[in-house]
């Protein structure tokens, strides 16, 4: 097997829903991180074998968004590109697709990542193309519809309620978890831990349609440093009557993009690139759609087995926080399977409840956060894992490459 490495992972700051990045389309955000990777590496984009990016929203004006963003970023016309979609693991799929292509000899070096502008997912008027003969037409919120599973007909938050019931997770436990996520993220931001992975996004401020200023967004804007358990308790459940899942203990809808080079170790050396980690193994698992949040507890064991590792070998875990209930359920399920689940290793700089979950971007974004923290701590192994809408889980195991 060829040794496959990750080079210069970067991400945009995460924008709140309708926030600072709302006027940036998913292709704009992707082009920004593509350019940043090329600038940081000094890489001639003509050497790329292909560009692969994950995206869920699939904007109609940017069909095959990987190709659109690649050309916007100045990547030569001769470099092909394609887009992958595995819901919340789309960014991870871009990396593992590149890994597979490398192992089969299709190429040696790929530009990978994920992008999402949930703020720009539209309302749609279904049936309007052929006209309406009678009565009212109804606008469909494509974002809300996209977050609803078509098999079990439950929105993602309702599937988190299912896990809270199954694993006996209380509202207070969820709120406490969420508060800790915000506290850790706030401290990490304050200490500059995200600075190396974030590339600024310039936005235009307008008044009455006229440009009045330009501003560079450099920080994630979804962190709520003032959240307490008492304040979290005031939020009502929104997915089930008398439920426990609330906006306070769920990830916020958000916007962002991430990118990196995935290539062979030999190619990195030949081009003078400095890898930050190597890919040890990866795995995807499938579960009941109504319990989709438990997916990581079945993907992690598969990836560990492939790598010949135990959970005790892992130093850091980035577990995407779609919902506090879902994360707590994953921990309980891992323990039930006999694993030594150590929360001190998990999301040490906070997670998506505080930092956002731009769905097609997140799995790639977590690679950036994980690898930089692995370098700081001189950790050997790290896991990037997430639940996946539709009833799946994804897991990527990385090994740090010293950059000293």
Where are these regions (language model features)?
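Conserved active-site "lid/cap" helical segment
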Residues: 1-61, 65-73, 80, 159-171, ...
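Conserved catalytic cysteine-centered active-site region
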Residues: 55-110, 150-155, 226-252, 336-365, ...
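Flexible glycine-/small-residue-enriched beta->alpha junction loops
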Residues: 109-162
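Condensing-enzyme catalytic core mediating Claisen C-C bond formation in acyl metabolism
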Residues: 1-24, 36, 228-294, 298, ...
